Amino acid sequence: MSNKGQLLQDPFLNALRKEHVPVSIYLVNGIKLQGNIESFDQYVVLLRNTVTQMVYKHAISTVVPARAVNFRVDDSSES
């Protein structure tokens, strides 16, 4: 994955994680998962509800926060 993709993903997911914002994650097959983001890396998101699930990013279609989240994107490398 390119660094440009990480410029949006990482700050967004990190804000959701730090602020303990409940999220709905829709997978490409239509399944809806709900919980809080516990952790993430380049390939997976750990989603905590009654159990912790490892969700591969390539299977994720959409991440919908339960409320608005402010996050900062470092756009100094943008042209």
Curated annotation (Swiss-Prot):
Signal peptide: none
A GO CC term attached to the entry: cytosol
Keywords: RNA-binding, Stress response
Pfam families, per database record: Hfq (PF17209)
Example of a GO MF term: RNA binding
Superkingdom to which the source organism belongs: Bacteria
UniProt GO BP: regulation of DNA-templated transcription; regulation of RNA stability; regulation of translation, ncRNA-mediated
Positions of transmembrane segments: none
SUPFAM superfamilies in UniProt: Sm-like ribonucleoproteins
Domain Sm: 10-69
The protein's role, per its UniProt record: RNA chaperone that binds small regulatory RNA (sRNAs) and mRNAs to facilitate mRNA translational regulation in response to envelope stress, environmental stress and changes in metabolite concentrations. Also binds with high specificity to tRNAs.
NCBIfam families: Hfq (TIGR02383), PRK00395.1 (NF001602)
Oligomer and partners: Homohexamer.
Family assignment from sequence similarity: Belongs to the Hfq family.
Name of this chain's protein: RNA-binding protein Hfq
